[in-house]
Amino acid sequence: MSVPTVLERIIARKFQEVAERSARVSLAELEGLAKAADAPRGFANALIEQAKRKQPAVIAEIKKASPSKGVIREHFVPAEIAVSYEKGGATCLSVLTDVDYFQGADEYLQQARAAVSLPVIRKDFMVDPYQIVEARALGADCVLLIVSALDDVKMAELAATAKDVGLDVLVEVHDGDELERALKTLDTPLVGVNNRNLHTFEVSLETTLDLLPRIPRDRLAITESGILNRADVELMAINEVYSFLVGEAFMRAEQPGLELQRLFFPEQVKKTVQQLD
């Protein structure tokens, strides 16, 4: 019998988590909270408009830890990081809410969103419509659907729930088969290509470059993971990829927003440093 991969263990835990949470707060209660939440901020639209101008559309991630790296950031204040990102030029935020594997929390999303005016995606492992409604109740503007964690029927069901509650969907793929499934099953304009293999956690930017020709022009290709320096950003720009999801490179920096500027808006860095002085 093969040993479950990290992704398989996470998904198994998510089913347990949904059972535990729905025993505490019913779906009907959650739907009421979702209806009462602040209006969505337009996650997809913000990215599309920025990328249209061939400007970096950056989803800046707020992440304390990961299964592959352990704790990434010791000094972790989500609201503070969110403000830093907004000042640094982020288009959107991504907040990890997975507790067991990423040391995330629902409260981190709420704290980050309350501190800024940027749209926010709930970065978690969605396996049940309950989690989608929960995301809207927490104030999220978008949810992540990971193709490798879902079959086509479940993927379509989760996307339909997202639409019902007013959430955008970012679908995440890692290879050609997953991309084909995503394009066939979902009409979301946001297609994230994760350069990290979620089974092995190995990273290669070639993943984005290989899949790019197969992503229709009416969808927005977002490269995720492994963007660490200006050369990586420039490589993507040459290939007309202007949308990025970046976490670790920022989280390891003393000032995450300043690191965002260094990577994506270097002409702004001098100005910011002068202001800080």
Swiss-Prot record:
Statement: the UniProt record of this protein carries the keyword Lyase: yes
Pathway(s) it belongs to: Amino-acid biosynthesis; L-tryptophan biosynthesis; L-tryptophan from chorismate: step 4/5
One BP annotation, GO: L-tryptophan biosynthetic process
InterPro entries: Aldolase_TIM, Indole-3-glycerol_P_synth, Indole-3-glycerol_P_synth_dom, Indole-3-GlycerolPSynthase_CS, RibuloseP-bd_barrel
Gene Ontology molecular-function annotations: indole-3-glycerol-phosphate synthase activity; phosphoribosylanthranilate isomerase activity
Gene3D superfamilies named among the record's database cross-references: Aldolase class I
Catalytic activity field: 1-(2-carboxyphenylamino)-1-deoxy-D-ribulose 5-phosphate + H(+) = (1S,2R)-1-C-(indol-3-yl)glycerol 3-phosphate + CO2 + H2O
E.C. designation(s): 4.1.1.48
Keyword Lipid biosynthesis: no
Keyword entries, A-Z: Amino-acid biosynthesis, Aromatic amino acid biosynthesis, Decarboxylase, Lyase, Tryptophan biosynthesis
Domain of life: Bacteria
Protein family per UniProt: Belongs to the TrpC family.
PANTHER family: INDOLE-3-GLYCEROL-PHOSPHATE SYNTHASE (PTHR22854:SF2), TRYPTOPHAN BIOSYNTHESIS PROTEIN (PTHR22854)
Stored HAMAP family: IGPS_B
Full protein name: Indole-3-glycerol phosphate synthase
Organism: Pseudomonas putida (strain ATCC 700007 / DSM 6899 / JCM 31910 / BCRC 17059 / LMG 24140 / F1)
Gene from which this protein is expressed: trpC
